[in-house]
Amino acid sequence: MTKIFLHGSGHQAASWRETIAQMPEGANILRPNLAALLERKTARFDNLCAAFAEYCAQAREPLDLCGLSLGGIVALAYALDHSQKVRSLVLIGTPHKVPKAAFALQNLVFRFLPAAAFRTMAFDKADTFALGNSMRALDFSARAHEIGCPTLILCGEKDRANLASARFFAAHIPQAEFEVIPGVGHIVNEEAPAQLARILTNFYAALD
């Protein structure tokens, strides 16, 4: 079964390396770079989702999707619109709607960062702003209950910005399992790759 791991906006596909290295050998795990999927199209959320749908269309069997932060949002959007193509869903530190106050603060901070500071992020400075602005009104509150596949909701104990959303998903997605990872912040795949690998391995083993 093909698994696709999607990174967050502040990181790149390589952020999954340590987690994947500690999962069972032979696991078919893809980790696309979200910016590369756009192929120079305008950095908007609808374009990103369309590009990801094209990427997923290459697979003949249902997919196991796992995403962190922005990656979780993209995975969730795909699962809602292509339910027949998704076997399972893992959402890590994923917001169920864009928090307006936090978004405004993040934009303020980003505005004063030099372009060079974005080199290790998923998108450059201009695309980060463009993508963020296209997601201002994003809200999955009314559709979370439509997710019908087995779903695992994960959130770091110290990721206070997303704990409420994790609990929302756990309460509203019918087949959701929920786990808070102790002592960990937002970037779970880099802060606790071994622990995350164990959790994911157990989740996927239960599906087989």
Question: What residues fall within each predicted segment?
Answer:
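Conserved alpha/beta-hydrolase "acid-adjacent" motif
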Residues: 160-165
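Flexible "cap/lid" loop of the alpha/beta hydrolase fold
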Residues: 45, 76, 80-81, 89-115
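Serine-hydrolase catalytic-loop signature spanning alpha/beta hydrolases and amidase-signature enzymes
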Residues: 10-18
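Gly/Ala-rich beta-loop-alpha elbow adjacent to hydrolase catalytic centers
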Residues: 67-71, 75
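Catalytic histidine-centered segment of alpha/beta-hydrolase-like enzymes
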Residues: 184-193
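Hydrophobic, aromatic-rich cap/lid helix
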Residues: 116-140, 157-158
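Short beta-strand/loop motif that positions the catalytic acidic residue
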Residues: 146-147, 153-155
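Active-site loop/oxyanion-hole signature of alpha/beta-hydrolase fold enzymes
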Residues: 17-21, 28-64, 198
